Amino acid sequence: MFFTLSLSASYILIPMEHDKQTNHLKAYGITYWVINQGIEAYWLLNYRGGSFAFPHTKGLENELKVRGVSYQVISDAQWIAIRSEISDPELNQEAVKLEKAPKIAVYTPDFNPRGNRIQPWDDAVTLVLAYAEIPFDKVYDREVLEGKLAQYDWLHLHHEDFTGQFGKFYASQGGTPWYKLNQAKTEELAASLGYSKVSALKLAVAQKIKEYVESGGFMFAM
């Protein structure tokens, strides 16, 4: 009943222009959710800011209202006209059918260097994904070396240091208790995974990520 198609309205269009969409992140999230429900969706590249469209149901319309996403209900004739406009070879536009919601991993530790558990709002990537309501898993060195990246379609990285040299804050913080604790914990992790040095651990992790990308995995790095 929830996904029964309306006979009077054919499609929902989610405009993505900066002045038309009230919540861009939630718009991405609702589109991910729609695809995950097995409903066909389209990404209209270079059309109205890269809009999204999918078949109309009252249930989907209600979900858009709950999430605060701007949308339009358009008729079947309007949808056909949009598709026709996009297909014009003179325009740099395309309607891409979205068929599978990607499984996402974020490379991030459970604790920050000071020993505090990292919350979604402490991390830029997890903050955005959590707010958009896009599901993701956190992975770190152990999961990468255990080959678990193969379970994911996308991998997100931050400003990562894979040298294992602990050099980022050494000059100003090298003698502080939190810095020494972080170094000790990282060395313990390396030892538990069979590495005598953190630099060797990080090299192995970087190589695993390289293999993941070479095998067709998508990586987004900052």
Model region roles, listed by residue range:
Residues I12, M16-T22, A53-N62, I80, ...:
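Helical hinge/lid and interdomain linker segments adjacent to catalytic or ligand-binding clefts
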